[in-house]
Amino acid sequence: MLRGNNIKKVNSLLVRSFHSTVGNRSGGPSTPINYPSLEIENAGEKQKMNLFQAINNGMDIAMQKDSKAVVFGEDVGFGGVFRCTVGLRDKYGASRVFNTPLCEQGIAGFAIGLAAQGATPIAEIQFADYIFPAFDQIVNEAAKYRYRSGGQFDCGSLTIRSPYGAVGHGGHYHSQSPESYFGHTPGLKVVIPSTPIEAKGLLLASIREKDPVIFFEPKLMYRSAVEEVPIGDYEIPLGKARIVKEGKDITIIGWGAQMRVLLQAVNMAEEKLGISCELIDLRTIQPWDVETVVESVKKTGRVVISHEAPKTGGWAAEISATIQERCFLHLEAPIQRVCGYDTPFPLIFEKFYVPDHLKNFESIKKTMVY
């Protein structure tokens, strides 16, 4: 197992690879996608930010407003491998922004203890692939703390941030999408933003949420997603999906970095085939917005759900089951899932593994002609 200086060298190489390929999973030229920005009411002054800067700004505001908020994790003191915590230690001091040992189980356990004692811990797991050593602490301790104490104690102020998903040359251990593991756990909330505006608003809502939250950040979007972000304090409600694009022929559902892939597929379907697609960004995986999805599917009668995680047991299966229960008589075609393969995440074959816009476009065509 890599530890200490060796793992720092590996992470440094991965980050440099990430910078060279960001915006295009195959490493080829990036095609800009005009992704619709979310409008925030009474937004006030705005500033151009990419996704990691919006997350940094969100944590900054949380720490300004809450003197009990602390940020910690591997290498967060110097800004983290993706720079999400840059400048926070200088501003708030080493007692509130600090490094931890390379021990994810310890990070999670320490965060649970802090939350139980009234602090507001914002813990970082450096890559979502390494959240598994902390799995027991998260699902058996954090998620059940309030329940098993009969409501006497809780660690609801806990937020665990972690970058997830494909990025280009990440390989087996820096590319995974583990959201469905945690979506299966009562007592946790699971949030995945797709834009800078949403990242900041959802993160602030997560930090102030009364249940523990796992906040997965699409590392592909850290620098490639750029918007005019309100610099003030605002929240986006958890558990509420966003209809990115309205349509009448087919419902397309995704989250995180997959949203830009889906928008590209939707645009292709409309330009080449005249298909009107309704595109939904779940934003919160647990609890997910059942009513928004059901209302859309009853209108369109056709559904494609896409995520990077393997198909079997992925969150698309849970959504599909609910749609089948709630919308059976409205369906005009079988529900389609466009997902990663049921294999470990490959290195050189990443381009073929990920559910790109072409795979989603073909699935839309297949569903429409059924």
Curated annotation (Swiss-Prot):
Q: What is its EC number?
A: 1.2.4.4
Q: Which InterPro entries does the UniProt record give? A: THDP-binding, Transketo_C/PFOR_II, Transketolase-like_Pyr-bd, Transketolase_C
Quote the subcellular location field of this record.
Answer: Mitochondrion matrix
- Which amino acid positions bind K(+), per UniProt? 156, 158-159, 209
Which segment is the transit peptide? 1-25
Please write the reaction equations for the catalytic activity of this protein.
N(6)-[(R)-lipoyl]-L-lysyl-[protein] + 3-methyl-2-oxobutanoate + H(+) = N(6)-[(R)-S(8)-2-methylpropanoyldihydrolipoyl]-L-lysyl-[protein] + CO2
Q: Name one GO biological process term.
A: branched-chain amino acid catabolic process
Name of one Pfam family that matches: Transket_pyr
Cofactor(s) needed for function: thiamine diphosphate
Residue numbers binding thiamine diphosphate: 130
Quaternary structure per UniProt? Heterotetramer of 2 alpha and 2 beta chains.
Recorded protein name is 2-oxoisovalerate dehydrogenase subunit beta, mitochondrial
Q: Which organism is it from?
A: Dictyostelium discoideum
Q: Which gene encodes it?
A: bkdB
